[in-house]
Regions:
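Extracytoplasmic/periplasmic substrate-recognition and gating elements
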Residues: 108-175
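Beta->alpha turn/N-cap motifs
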Residues: 81, 98-103, 119, 135-137
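Short helix-initiation/N-cap motifs at beta->coil->alpha
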Residues: 75-90
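Short, solvent-exposed loop/beta-turn-alpha elements that line the ligand-binding surface or hinge
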Residues: 17-20, 35-60, 108, 121-131, ...
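Long, aromatic- and glycine/proline-rich binding clefts that accommodate carbohydrate-like moieties
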Residues: 170-200
Length: 200
């Protein structure tokens, strides 16, 4: 794609903005891949045991992103998450790294024009891995909170995934909120949850 960028009119990747609205996509989400493969290969379970076995793989995928993007690597510090979305939606880039929560940002392209791919970094067996799921994508309840607050929190979480109005707000997109605003478009992997309109 990069060799024919001018002819095609688009780059391979959106800008990898390094401001706070975008850097987490690369400093945490992308960085999870080499850490996962090291945990798996070495049977480790703590960050203290990380040796950086797949650090070069991480560097290579990062270099692929920034050297085949809509902008020069020297301007990454000025690029934002909104820039990346705009570049993808306007057809200036073929690939945009993000997760299911970003569906609403790109849905205007039409479901027939978008999809998700695994990120490959050259780790053995990764062709069988499939899509990543974020390690930070879970709900927590503070064990040090009062029993009353713990119960209220658990009741709220249960309500979010069982109540018809709440599930519609969580899973829906266009006009899914009681206010008529767009819903969150999340995919809820629980029995009985409404099917999400989120393609991802």
């Amino acid at each position: 794609i990069t060799a024919r960028k001018d002819e095609l009119g688009f780059a391979a990747f959106t800008s990898a903005g390094m401001d706070g609205s975008s850097d987490w996509r690369f400093k945490t989400h992308l960085a999870n891949l080499p850490i996962y493969y090291e945990y798996k290969a070495d049977g480790i379970g703590t960050t203290d045991a990380i040796k950086g076995t797949y650090l070069n793989n991480y560097r290579q995928i990062w270099d692929l992103y920034i050297n085949n993007a809509t902008c020069e690597p020297t301007v990454l510090s000025t690029k934002t998450g909104d820039d990346a979305v705009a570049e993808f939606v306007s057809g200036k880039a073929a690939f945009y790294q993000n997760g299911t929560w970003a569906y609403g940002d790109v849905a205007s392209l039409g479901d027939e024009n978008i999809g998700m791919l695994p990120i490959y970094i050259g780790a053995e067996g990764e062709e069988n891995q499939g899509l990543c799921t974020g390690t930070e994508n879970y709900w927590c309840v503070n064990a040090k909170a009062s029993e009353e607050d713990i119960k209220a929190t658990l009741d709220f979480i249960n309500w979010c995934v069982t109540d018809e109005v709440a599930v519609k707000a969580m899973c829906g997109t266009d006009k899914a909120m009681p206010s008529g605003e767009a819903g969150m478009g999340f995919v809820i992997p629980f029995k009985g949850a409404a099917e999400s309109t989120n393609l991802f």
